[in-house]
Amino acid sequence: MEVNVFEPKNIYEKILEHTNKHGLKDKRLCFNLTGGTKMMFLAGLKASEYFQAPYFYIEEKAQRLLFFKNPSSIESFAIPAIPIKDVETFFSLHVPNRMIKQNGIIDEKSLEKIQERKNLSNLLYEHRARIIPLYQKINNNYAKDKTINICENNMRMFYRDHQVFVNIDGKEINLKYSENEDDFRDYIIGGWLEEYIYCELLELLDKQVIYDLRLNMRLSVESMTATQGGKRPIYAELDIAFSDSKNLYVVECKSGELKNKGVLTALSTNTQIFGGANAKCILVASDTDILSQNIQERIKNLNIKLISRDFKKNIENY
């Protein structure tokens, strides 16, 4: 049932329309008021009153279900913890109307390619303070003729026809970039950090500290598109996602300067939409120096975990 998630009147009318259409008015109804927006909660509450039907609410953090037969009768039931190791199970629970454009599963062939670039990703991370200020220059270089030729500050970076050459302070890397050419630009101006973090987390995956590690997922929910009033689906992009068997974790990787607070709002909102109230969102920043004081306050207010060093250790302990 498609609704405008921020218009309680629209939601309420859609519920009545749905029940009438399917002949549910005289059936025994019970409303689940868990999740969604506050407007959805209020509309569901009003609908339950209209039908004089009970409703329930699941407190995820307390692991209990609150059942309301009427406003004066509340029963509480403990919910046994069931391990959820599959990322998409969280999506099924919280957004059954999801659409997955890119599932983020790294197959053996893709993993080999990431491993081939691992030394380059490590080198870029090691010298990130010198690389990041060159992002715009690299982008402009590539835009001209799909080549990159940078030589400054004891650093050489060259790219043409899938051939990559990087030399920083005498440390040299030659490799053939086997992906789509346009993907290399995305990689060199920030995608390397996503791959760097992914490789860091592989050890936690092997130790079964985390499960179902995904990279670069793209998802959409019908209500997200309906809210924007568009026909084309609006996709949420998750840089990295995984489970610890209890909660969904969503990681946003940022190597360059972060100016747009909307990125943080989207991270927080998408994490709760796809993983529920207990889902955890992490911002991985290559350095806290790229974050202004206002941005850092926003991160704190949105309950986002900021990690800028010892990534594997800090993520494991979060």
Residue ranges and their predicted role:
Residues 32-43:
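Gly/Ser/Thr-rich loops at beta-strand to alpha-helix junctions
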Residues 34, 239-241, 254:
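Anionic group-transfer/hydrolysis microenvironments
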Residues 1-28, 42-236, 246-247, 256-318:
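Long, low-complexity, Lys/Arg-enriched
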